Swiss-Prot record:
It comes from Rattus norvegicus. Its main location: mitochondrion. This is Carbonic anhydrase 5A, mitochondrial. Residues 35-295 form the Alpha-carbonic anhydrase domain. Its cofactor is Zn(2+). Mitochondrial carbonic anhydrase that catalyzes the reversible conversion of carbon dioxide to bicarbonate/HCO3. Mitochondria are impermeable to HCO3, and thus this intramitochondrial carbonic anhydrase is pivotal in providing HCO3 for multiple mitochondrial enzymes that catalyze the formation of essential metabolites of intermediary metabolism in the urea and Krebs cycles. Belongs to the alpha-carbonic anhydrase family. Keywords: Lyase, Metal-binding, Mitochondrion, Transit peptide, Zinc. GO terms for molecular function: carbonate dehydratase activity; zinc ion binding. Residues 1-34 form a transit peptide.
């Protein structure tokens, strides 16, 4: 039974590894929205409770998020499919961080994680969270060809072959791998509803609800094509330790599901209520980085 409480971990549960693979992909999503001044109008560099520095890390050359240019990405035939193996029983709790809602996992063993693709080692799952906007016109951190999605999912993993814990991996070279998944409005998402149903219990900052087994691979798109590039965390400490893996195709969620995200608060109990929206970082310059794709990009003028 789910119960709301202040910060703390839930009980341990036995392991049960689940693996998922997806079918062939469409060439290009057919649902683009253009937001002219997304970064300029909706900058929120002061939103994060730990944010005391500038929008960009001082001297940083590999900051995230970025605008992914479809035709400028470079196809890399050496990029294998990403291997995903998440243990549903390692899910611990969902909490309101004061910046977004986040689902935490037991990362003390190797059962939940990813490997393959652009990664040289196994990376353990630590947590996942979402970013979203005040309206359905924007909310994602990354853009594709200048187009924003209403929301973006981030699954955060750390290099357990190179570092002894998540904290050390956060600021270490090749320390983190983050999967990015865009959300678009469409059909009701059955698996996401499990999270949506308990959001009212974590409306305020620093509240938590214990969860039973949950396999986050149910939130991945069927198509596993992706872009990858070297980047950073999008919240403090903005460490440039991240291998980003951004899925080409989004998942569909219903308008009512996304609206429930916007019922959460940045504020804690007893504080003036401040609605949790626009919890994304503005776009950062590419600065000569290569964005590689696991799929071939059709040339202009060719049929998909």
């Amino acid at each position: 039974m789910l119960r709301a409480k202040m910060l703390g971990r839930g009980p341990y549960k036995p392991l049960a590894i689940l693996r998922h693979m997806g079918p062939l992909c469409a060439t290009r999503p057919q649902h683009w929205r253009f937001q002219h001044s997304y970064a300029e109008k909706h900058s929120n560099c002061a939103r994060h409770p730990l944010w005391t520095g500038p929008v960009s890390s001082p001297g940083g050359t590999q900051q995230s998020p970025i605008n992914i240019q479809w035709t400028d990405s470079v196809y890399d035939p050496k990029l294998a499919p990403l291997r995903v193996s998440y243990d549903a029983a390692s899910c611990r709790y969902l909490w309101n961080t004061g910046y977004f809602f986040q689902v935490e996992f037991d990362d003390s063993c190797e059962e939940s994680g990813i490997s393959g693709g652009p990664l040289g080692n196994h990376y353990r799952l630590k947590q996942f969270h979402f970013h979203w906007g005040a309206t359905d016109e924007w909310g994602s951190e990354h853009m594709v060809d200048g187009h924003a999605y209403p929301a973006e999912l981030h699954l955060v993993h750390w290099n357990s072959m190179k570092y002894e814990n998540y904290k050390k991996a956060t600021t270490g070279e090749n320390g983190l791998a983050v999967i990015g998944v865009f959300l678009k409005l469409g059909a009701h998402h059955e698996a996401l509803q499990r999270l949506v149903d308990i959001l009212p219990e974590v409306r305020h900052k620093d509240t938590q609800v214990t969860m039973g087994p949950f396999d986050p691979s149910c939130l991945l798109p069927a198509c596993r094509d992706y872009w990858t590039y070297p980047g950073s965390l999008t919240t403090p400490p903005l460490a440039e330790s991240v291998t980003w893996i951004v899925h080409k195709m989004p998942i569909e969620v219903s308008p009512s599901q996304l609206s429930t995200f916007r019922t959460l608060l940045f504020s804690g109990r007893g504080e003036d209520e401040e609605v949790m929206v626009n919890n994304f970082r503005p776009l950062q310059p590419l600065r000569g980085r290569n964005v590689r794709s696991s799929f071939q990009v059709p040339r202009v003028g060719t049929k998909s």
